């Protein structure tokens, strides 16, 4: 495989450690563990990471890490040599480790299976059957489990019906020409053969993973009742032989399937420090390369202040001693997310992040990384006016968002599973997470603009308490309970489904009106008990952010007509009456968690939605009897 260019932002989301990437030539490889990032071509770790560090103390405090680091960019050393051959640039020739996976491949001519090492960089191998070198094709299947493990499909064990087989015969992957797994079979030179029927099936007998027995686990061992368990492989650690104990039942999936890798990320909007002087000092420190790792070298706050004054003497001489001290403490300790016993829960800490953002977004602010202009506050008395359903509109002309990769899931995006993976995410991302030098997580920062608005809270509470709304919504709660689905109880509320659906239809309308592709517009929901806000924004990796088209739509003369059009458009789906009727009766979408919502009316691209296109229902918006906007 040739060197594969990836964007830095992709390494924090879609293509993080443990993910499979496909090259333009069709070869697949796995991103290596974080232990091997920031190593040069000689496999040596670089000495300083200061230039990659992102200052977001709130997230560092929440995630209990010392550093948030941007993935390294590639700088070829030959471009930075002077006339005498000396390298004039630091941190050159940094690669992200790639490991060939799956390691099994077959000859396109004779279909014979061959296995190569994960370090192999070529698809050209000597075919024992054809007696010449052939460009091999990697097999389409891998084996995964919901605990994050991934392995080569057990071809030899499957064809012999025995996980302890000793046969080392030559195998072939043959097709009889059909379009189902039954038409694919594996054949061994010992005359054993078997179709692949059932390898991707799973029978669910309980909401507990240990009882979700896959057909692969039940059928692999033909002659005994032994259930096949996941071997616990973590090939992204760099070794084909690394295994750990696992009680899960694996399942075969296509290697390019979306459920092979679901990244778990957490993000935060950068908020200004309450003291504007401290905020300015933090930016001065960042500009001069004064980071957390740098401050930790110096002992004592007084010594740190002395050294900082020497490095930034001309820029900070007018600032108070106390402000300089606070700026240093902010970087070191992450002031802003207090650590207390009652806030040790990750869920509570995430809520605290959103609460502080909400409290900031309702204000008028003008700082370097966050600029908010108050546009409109509800003063209208006319109940027939659409504006009476809203209480506030603010135009966010500039924002900075930091996105951190905390772990990943395979097979499921279940809320409880995602929460558990976040708690143990470092053990998936790092081979040795407890080493002092591994106390960091990969992060990426983006700049953008957006519209922040809140719903009339009193009107929302009154609507939510109506018996017909409660009766209708209880159907969704019953469906989740019957299926044993784990979703945060604070999320399953009529108001939250309403806000989420409203966000989607407004994003769709904004994409049509202001020319943005809907994939580039995102939502950020504020759903805590006393909040009912939505931030619709767009962002990019460029520090200049975007061009103001979305912010312009936040002006009241543009925003309310957009809302009216969005609601009118939501009244009819091209899949109606099916969409509406199924939504009212049995629900639809993954685990039937949606009401009247489908790809034709309410779904957004995955990059835009915070909740995976779940918990959507147009009925709560526009139904003549119980719709919020008809109340």
Which sequence ranges carry the predicted segments?
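Nucleic-acid endo/exonuclease domains
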Residues: 203, 217, 258
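A short alpha->loop->secondary-structure connector
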Residues: 165
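A Rossmann-like FAD-binding core segment of flavoenzymes
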Residues: 206-210
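C-terminal interaction appendages of subunits in large macromolecular complexes
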Residues: 186-190
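Extended, well-ordered protein cores
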Residues: 1-159, 170-175, 182, 227-631
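Short Cys/His-rich micro-motifs in 6-15 aa windows
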Residues: 131-134, 192-199
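Short, surface-exposed polybasic-aromatic patches that bind anionic ligands, especially phosphate groups
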Residues: 118, 200-202
């Amino acid at each position: 495989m040739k060197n594969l260019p990836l964007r830095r932002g992709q390494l924090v989301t879609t293509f993080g450690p443990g993910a499979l990437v496909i090259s333009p030539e069709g070869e697949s490889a796995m991103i290596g563990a974080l232990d091997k990032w920031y190593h040069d071509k000689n496999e040596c770790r670089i000495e300083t990471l200061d230039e990659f560090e992102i200052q977001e103390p709130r997230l560092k405090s929440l995630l209990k890490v010392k550093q948030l680091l941007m993935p390294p960019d590639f700088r070829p050393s030959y471009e930075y040599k002077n006339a005498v051959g000396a390298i004039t640039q630091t941190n050159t020739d940094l690669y992200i480790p790639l490991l060939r996976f799956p390691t099994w491949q077959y000859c396109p001519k004779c279909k014979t299976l061959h296995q190569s090492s994960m370090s192999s960089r070529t698809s050209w191998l000597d075919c024992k059957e054809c007696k010449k070198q052939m460009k091999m094709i990697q097999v389409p299947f891998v084996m995964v489990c919901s605990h994050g493990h991934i392995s080569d499909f057990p071809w030899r064990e499957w064809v012999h019906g025995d996980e302890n087989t000793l046969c080392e015969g030559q195998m072939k992957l043959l097709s009889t020409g059909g379009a189902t797994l039954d038409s694919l079979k594996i054949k061994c030179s010992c005359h054993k053969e078997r179709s692949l029927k059932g390898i991707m099936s799973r029978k669910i007998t309980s909401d507990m993973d240990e009882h979700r027995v896959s057909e692969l686990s039940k059928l692999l061992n033909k002659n005994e009742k032994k259930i096949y368990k996941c071997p616990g492989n973590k090939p992204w650690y760099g070794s084909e032989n690394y295994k750990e104990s696992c009680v899960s039942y694996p399942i075969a999936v296509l290697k390019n399937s979306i459920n092979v890798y679901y990244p778990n990320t957490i993000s935060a909007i950068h908020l200004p420090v309450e003291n504007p002087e401290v905020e300015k000092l933090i930016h001065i420190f960042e500009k001069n390369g004064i980071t957390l790792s740098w401050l930790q070298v110096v002992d004592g706050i007084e010594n740190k202040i002395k050294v900082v004054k020497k490095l930034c003497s001309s820029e900070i001489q007018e600032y108070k001693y106390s402000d300089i001290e606070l700026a240093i403490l902010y970087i070191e300790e992450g002031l802003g997310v207090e650590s207390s016993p009652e806030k040790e829960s990750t869920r509570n800490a995430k809520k605290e992040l959103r609460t502080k953002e909400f409290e900031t977004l309702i204000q008028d602010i003008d700082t370097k990384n966050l600029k908010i202009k108050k546009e409109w506050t509800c003063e209208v008395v006319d109940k027939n006016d659409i504006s009476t359903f809203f209480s506030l509109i603010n135009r966010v002309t500039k924002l900075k968002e930091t996105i951190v990769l905390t772990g990943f899931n395979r097979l499921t995006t279940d809320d409880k599973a995602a929460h558990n993976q976040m708690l143990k995410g470092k053990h998936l991302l790092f081979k040795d997470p407890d080493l002092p030098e591994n106390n960091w997580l990969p992060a990426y920062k983006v700049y953008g603009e957006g519209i922040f608005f809140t719903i009339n809270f009193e009107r929302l509470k009154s609507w939510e308490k109506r018996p017909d709304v409660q009766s209708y919504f209880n159907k969704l709660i019953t469906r989740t309970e019957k299926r044993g689905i784990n979703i945060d109880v604070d999320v399953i509320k009529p108001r939250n489904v309403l806000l989420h659906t409203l966000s989607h239809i407004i994003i769709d309308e904004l994409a049509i009106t202001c020319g943005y592709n809907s994939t580039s517009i995102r939502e950020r929901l504020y759903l805590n008990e006393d909040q009912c806000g939505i931030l619709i924004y767009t962002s990019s990796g460029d520090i200049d952010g975007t061009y103001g088209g979305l912010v312009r739509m936040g002006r009241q003369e543009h925003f309310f007509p957009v809302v009216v059009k969005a609601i009118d458009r939501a009244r009819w789906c091209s899949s109606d009456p099916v969409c509406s009727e199924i939504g009212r009766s049995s629900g639809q979408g993954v685990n039937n968690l949606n009401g009247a919502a489908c790809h034709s009316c309410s779904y957004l691209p995955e990059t835009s939605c915070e909740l995976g296109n779940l918990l959507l229902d147009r009925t709560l918006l526009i139904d003549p009897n119980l719709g919020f906007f008809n109340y």
